[in-house]
Amino acid sequence: MNQSDKDIKGTTTVGLACKDGIVLATEKRATMGSLVANKGAEKLFKLDKKTGATIAGTVSHAQSLMDVLKAEISLYRLSNGKDMSIDALAVLCSNILKSGPFYVQTILGGIDKDGAKLYSLDPSGSYIKDECISTGSGSPYAYGVLEDRYNPEISVDEGKIIALKALSSAMERDVYSGNGYRLATITDDGMKIYSEDEISEVVKEF
């Protein structure tokens, strides 16, 4: 358990609920203790048309969890003829984590018929609905920016700048976070994952 705790803390992710959607952002460094094991780790996933997630923790567990969630979302649509709500997805993810062990902390975000929703889940399966979330070892530094700049009335265009600024603050102070950004926004038009060039343009707006 001690090793898993270290794995889960060794990253920084951010999720924001905005007036017109969701912003999800992560940095790209993967570590094994004091070793930088990967400088381009994928910690941001598209689960469905308007649903995404960030992960922190053991890589194999995180990938397995994301695969299971994608499959369950597709099965639900086939069986019920409609999309799974974000609330139901959070409960499903909680039940999967409880059946673990999955040494994973995740942020789930998306848009359903009731609007934009954001959840944080830990390895025990506990889940919390919130509007502004950061996870991982860099989260104290990220929250310093988020608490100063975030409010629920911001747009996703404003939110993506704030999210990357929060990650930048974490990357400056946390040795387990770094090597660039991943960024996605979710609106009524769907989930958009940003390219490196598009992210560079957002960073210029800091």
Annotated model-derived regions:
Residues 45, 54-56, 107-109, 122, ...:
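Residues in well-ordered beta-strands of folded domains
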Residues 104-116, 172-185:
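Conserved phosphate-donor
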Residues 165-171:
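C-terminal catalytic subdomain
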Residues 1-102, 128, 133-161, 175-177, ...:
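Conserved short S/T/G-enriched processing/targeting/catalytic segments and their helical context
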Residues 22, 116-120, 183, 191:
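Hydrophobic beta-strand positions in blades of beta-propellers and related beta-sheet-rich domains
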